[in-house]
C-alpha cells in the first residue's frame, strides 16, 4: 500500500536538489530514495494551504515540531539534528506542539538521544545516524598526501587555541605544513587579520561547495575536529570518505565514530603539535592502511546502508 509521505525541512532557501548542504541535503537524498519505492512522497520547505488540507500518512519534520499543529498526519516523526532542551523548546515555541502531538523521535546519534530531555513524551525514540550524500561516496583514492590539515567546524570554539599553537609550535618548526580553515564566517575570527595569517601557512577559505572541500580533503593528511558540542558531525564522515583521519578530543557524538584506526585522539591542546608531527612522519604503509580504513569505515554511512532502518521506521 502506497502512503502519502511528506519531508518537511524549514529553510529560507529554495530546495535545489543539486546545490544544498547539511540538513537540506540529508532530507533531499532520503526523500529521493523513499520516492523510488513510494511514489506519493513529497518534500517542502514551507507551509502552504495545500499541504495543510492534505491528509498525510507520515510527516517527517527536521527540528521543527510546530509544523505538526498545521498538518493532518496519522504519524508524526520529528527528526532531531540538534539539541532541544526544555528552555530552548519554550523559547522556540516547540514545547506544546511536542507535548500535545503524538510524536516519534529520530535522533542522529546516541549522544543526542541521551542529551534530549526525558520530559518529552515521545511515542518512540530511535537512533538513525546521518549519512553521506552522493558527492562523498565512492571517491577516487589519493595516497599521495600533501602536508595539509583542515578545519571545517562552523563553530569557532577551540580554533583560537589551534591557531596560537600553529603559529608558535608548528609553523616555527616546519614552514611547509599548512592549515586550511573552512566553514567559518570572517566575523567569527575578528581577533585576527586573516590575510596576515597566511604568513604562518594558515588560510581562511570561508564557505565553499562540496567539490572544493573534496579537493582539499583528498590532498590533506588530517582534519582537526575537537568534538565540542557535536550532535553528529557530518564533517567527520565526509573526511573519512576522503581517506582523512581525525585529530580530536573524542567528545560528544564524535566519540561514537572515532577509534585508534581512523583518528588521533588527544587529551588536550598540549598534544596537538606532537600529533601533527606524528602524522607528518607516518610511515608510507601506515598512512596507506589508515587511508584505506577511513574510507572503508565511511561506507557504513552510505545511504544504502542506512536506508533499511528508515524504511522499517516508515513502515515501507
Predicted regions and their residues:
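Conserved donor-binding/catalytic core segment of Leloir-type glycosyltransferases
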Residues: 140-158, 163-167
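Aromatic "clamp/platform" in nucleotide-sugar-dependent glycosyltransferases that forms part
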Residues: 228
Amino acid at each position: 500500500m502506497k502512503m502519502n509521505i511528506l519531508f518537511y525541512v524549514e529553510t529560507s532557501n529554495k530546495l535545489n536538489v543539486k546545490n544544498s548542504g547539511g540538513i537540506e541535503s540529508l532530507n533531499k537524498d532520503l526523500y529521493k530514495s523513499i520516492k523510488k519505492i513510494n511514489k506519493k512522497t513529497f518534500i517542502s520547505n514551507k507551509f502552504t494551504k495545500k499541504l495543510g488540507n492534505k491528509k498525510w500518512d507520515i510527516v517527517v519534520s527536521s527540528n521543527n515540531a510546530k509544523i505538526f499543529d498545521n498538518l493532518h498526519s496519522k504519524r508524526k516523526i520529528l527528526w532531531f539534528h540538534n539539541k532541544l532542551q526544555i528552555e530552548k523548546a519554550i523559547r522556540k515555541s516547540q514545547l506544546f506542539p511536542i507535548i500535545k502531538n503524538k510524536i516519534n523521535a529520530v535522533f542522529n546519534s546516541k549522544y543526542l538521544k541521551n542529551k534530549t530531555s526525558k520530559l518529552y513524551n515521545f511515542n518512540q525514540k530511535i537512533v538513525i545516524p546521518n549519512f553521506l550524500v552522493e558527492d562523498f561516496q565512492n571517491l577516487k583514492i589519493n595516497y599521495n598526501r600533501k602536508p595539509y590539515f583542515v578545519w571545517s567546524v562552523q563553530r569557532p570554539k577551540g580554533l583560537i587555541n589551534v591557531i596560537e599553537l600553529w603559529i608558535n609550535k608548528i609553523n616555527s618548526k616546519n614552514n611547509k605544513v599548512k592549515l586550511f580553515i573552512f566553514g567559518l564566517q570572517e566575523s567569527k575570527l575578528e581577533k585576527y587579520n586573516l590575510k596576515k595569517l597566511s604568513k604562518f601557512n594558515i588560510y581562511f577559505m570561508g564557505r565553499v561547495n562540496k567539490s572544493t572541500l573534496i579537493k582539499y580533503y583528498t590532498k590533506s593528511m588530517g582534519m582537526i575536529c575537537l568534538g565540542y558540542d557535536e550532535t553528529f558531525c557530518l564533517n567527520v564522515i565526509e573526511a573519512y570518505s576522503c581517506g582523512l583521519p581525525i585529530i580530536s578530543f573524542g567528545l560528544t557524538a564524535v566519540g561514537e565514530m572515532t577509534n585508534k584506526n581512523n583518528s588521533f585522539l588527544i587529551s588536550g591542546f598540549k598534544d596537538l603539535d606532537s600529533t601533527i608531527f606524528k602524522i607528518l612522519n607516518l610511515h608510507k604503509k601506515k598512512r596507506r592502511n589508515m587511508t584505506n580504513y577511513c574510507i572503508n569505515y565511511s561506507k557504513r554511512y552510505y545511504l544504502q546502508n542506512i536506508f533499511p532502518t528508515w524504511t522499517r521506521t516508515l513502515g515501507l
